[in-house]
Amino acid sequence: MATVNQLVRKPRAPKVDKTNVPALNACPQKRGVCTRVYTTTPKKPNSALRKVARVRLTNGFEVTSYIGGEGHNLQEHSVILIRGGRVKDLPGVRYHTVRGALDCAGVNTRRQGRSKYGAKRPKS
């Protein structure tokens, strides 16, 4: 236990929280350019071809971003918006692509949960 005198001389250092999304620099989203668009396989026990993109952000970071939804129009040099949020079965993927923003089209066939996929309300 520190004495009062010791605490006056050198106060206690506050604990620093480590962020799960360092590339965002405390911003809600960041813009970037796709350097590579490809599929990868999840870890056990899951099996699929998950669509991901390697993205060069405006702040110089290069990160891997997951492309959610069925089908996408992304290719190399597409400009996209990324947000935080990891993909549990893809190691190293800590970011999600925002659908319906910049060059990334929304998911046309979406009827429910549309806002997360950039889909407009269908004409009934």
UniProtKB/Swiss-Prot annotation:
This is Small ribosomal subunit protein uS12. GO terms for molecular function: rRNA binding; structural constituent of ribosome; tRNA binding. The modification 3-methylthioaspartic acid is found at D89. Gene3D superfamilies: Nucleic acid-binding proteins (2.40.50.140). Part of the 30S ribosomal subunit. Contacts proteins S8 and S17. May interact with IF1 in the 30S initiation complex. The gene is rpsL. GO terms for cellular component: small ribosomal subunit. HAMAP family: Ribosomal_uS12_B. Keywords: Methylation, Ribonucleoprotein, Ribosomal protein, RNA-binding, rRNA-binding, tRNA-binding. It comes from Shewanella sp. (strain ANA-3). With S4 and S5 plays an important role in translational accuracy. PANTHER family: 30S RIBOSOMAL PROTEIN S12 FAMILY MEMBER. The lineage of its organism: Bacteria, Pseudomonadati, Pseudomonadota, Gammaproteobacteria, Alteromonadales.
